[in-house]
């Protein structure tokens, strides 16, 4: 785990099973930030190919994924990312330099197996499509994905992010 906003002393970690660094995950390394590949190296997980990545980093997910090599991404069996700022999809620069490259990078080796729109932020109409500002996507590595591919939304375990707002699908 890594999070620049949390002090490790406040966590009840099980030594040998959990690893934590007080840094932001980003597309570069400095005293406060690190790349995904640096985190894997620091956690001594470079030989693993069965990792789970859950990323909710408020917009830094794009730079983090763009700067991560294909071989590093393939160390993860499952990737769960909350994508922010999707209202910018109407901006060509964001679409072509951030969103599309990230999706291409991930979909090269992963299948999207679940999509959950966040109902706590507004919906935008972009080219006739209703798009949430924030969307959580779950990806499963293709070489591990032997299950039946079914399309159904919502999933029975989906819950609202904001119980006071209507669910969006």
Task: Give the role of each language-model region.
Residues 1-34, 42, 48-49, 87:
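SAM cofactor-binding core of SAM-dependent methyltransferases
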Residues 17, 39-169:
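Conserved acidic-Pro-Pro-aromatic motif
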């Amino acid at each position: 785990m890594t999070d620049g906003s949390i002090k490790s002393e406040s966590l009840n970690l099980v030594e040998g099973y959990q690893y934590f660094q007080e840094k932001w995950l980003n597309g570069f390394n400095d005293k406060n930030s690190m790349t995904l590949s640096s985190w894997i190296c620091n956690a001594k997980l470079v030989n693993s190919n069965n990792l789970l990545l859950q990323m909710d980093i408020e917009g830094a997910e794009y730079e983090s994924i763009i700067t991560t090599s294909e071989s590093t991404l393939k160390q993860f069996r499952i990737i769960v990312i909350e994508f922010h700022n999707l209202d910018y999809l109407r901006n060509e620069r964001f679409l072509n330099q951030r969103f599309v490259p990230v999706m291409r990078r991930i979909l090269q080796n992963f299948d999207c197996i679940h999509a959950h729109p966040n109902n706590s932020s507004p919906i935008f109409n972009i080219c006739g499509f209703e798009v949430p500002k924030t969307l959580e996507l779950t990806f499963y590595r293709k070489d591990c994905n032997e299950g039946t591919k079914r399309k159904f939304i919502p999933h029975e375990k989906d819950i609202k992010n904001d119980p006071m707002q209507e669910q969006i699908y």
